[in-house]
Amino acid sequence: MYHIFERGCDVMMKIAIWGYGNYGRRMFESLTRFCSEEYEIVRVYDTAYQNLKQTEGEVILPIHNPQELPEDYKNDLFEKVFICIFYASQKPKQFLREHGIPELCIGGPEDLFPLSSFEQGEKPFEIGREGYDFYVIKNLYGAMANYESVEMLYLFDNEGRVVKEHRDHFDPEYFEWFKYPFVLWHSKAEKVFLKGRYCILTKKHSNNYWHYTYSNLEVVWLLEKAGFQGKYVVPALEYGSELLRLLDVPPERIITLNVFEHNKIYVFEEIYYVVPVKPFGDDLVYGSPVLLEAVACIKKKLSLDPSLPKRIYVKRIGKRKLLGADEIIAEYGFSTIIPEKYSVREQISLFFNADIVFCVHGANSTNCLYMRKGTVFIEAFSSYWMNRCNLYALATEGVSYLPVSTLETVRDNKDGVLRDFTFPESLLRITIQNAFLIFQAQHGQQ
């Protein structure tokens, strides 16, 4: 058997890849093109092996049934298995553990370094707000994550040191998500040099509207107020650009991630980075004053439209749906809104105009930030997945908040996060009735 590869070691490790979907194909290409001196891929496995047959590109390997993994490992065909099944890797991990097969993990906490340890540039201004650190970093590298084309750039340097702060601040153990596209230190991947000043807003989870809003709106607000004239790199999703345009950032200063290519390294002349200093305390983590200043700026651009409904039900159509509630909610005069049918600005306007919003918890709940003082927001939770994402901002903004769950005790949350759920009819009705009472009391209605 071969020894584990370490930096500076010239011994290759024979590995197998499990998973040959889009993510697996990109990782296979990265490892065979740029890491051939560190890792030798000798086997590829996928449950769809009968349809896939073999790999594509310069290196051709047959694709095998994952059930063959234990026997192949016993026969010393490979040393470790690299799982390339994103968002569905727990069962494969368990399978490997049960059969005593080591898993290959590319990247870990030892690769993360604070921004203060990178090459510092000259600051043309200061942020001037307590609770934030501000950096200008020179010659920082960026590489697209292979698992999600619209979401993330890794930020690192030529020594393979990854920026510790480049993460979603609500998911601090983010190194577990890192699946480096290639060996980062002294990589052989093609380098593309980008002159000028950049702010990178494509962090982990930036493909989620709530996470993007809460992690990045305050950053843009602070930089714009300080006089930043550089460009922003945003997710290739509508809200990535639209929220910045609502903060008066012109389109020519917004770059969507889809203009970048996989398996290339982008060398940024200067990156401007604003980091919230944690802990703020829960109330500020989930709704800092700076975030709410940015929201207030957006709300000033909105207007009341009498043609829009005053009661809206924001319905989920993917996973974690609220089942069997549509007709009951409609009885109380709610108009059903499916967010996917509206632009970001249209969604924001619907929330701004509504007196009462009934929303199933999810990223679409983010738009409660744009509700008016004295309105009511009902948020429906499955007992498998509850949090305070919107509590503190709503309390500060003067929006009455009615969180409601299925009122069930859940003892095992492993597989329940994405489940659909139901409410007892009596609970659904009393929640809506309470919302009416609160709104009427606030506005002097009988």
Task: Annotate each language-model stretch with its function.
Residues 41-49, 107-110, 335-340:
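A short beta-strand-loop structural module common to alpha/beta enzyme folds
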Residues 13-31:
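Glycine-rich adenosine-cofactor-binding loop
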Residues 34-39, 72-76, 100, 226, ...:
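Short, conserved loop/helix-junction motifs that constitute active-site signature segments
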Residues 2-11:
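Short, Lys/Arg-enriched N-terminal segments with co-localized hydrophobic residues
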Residues 110-446:
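The feature primarily captures lumenal catalytic ectodomains
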Residues 49-114:
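Phosphate-bearing ligand-interacting subdomains
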Residues 45-52, 87-88, 237-239, 362-363:
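Short, polar loop motifs at secondary-structure junctions
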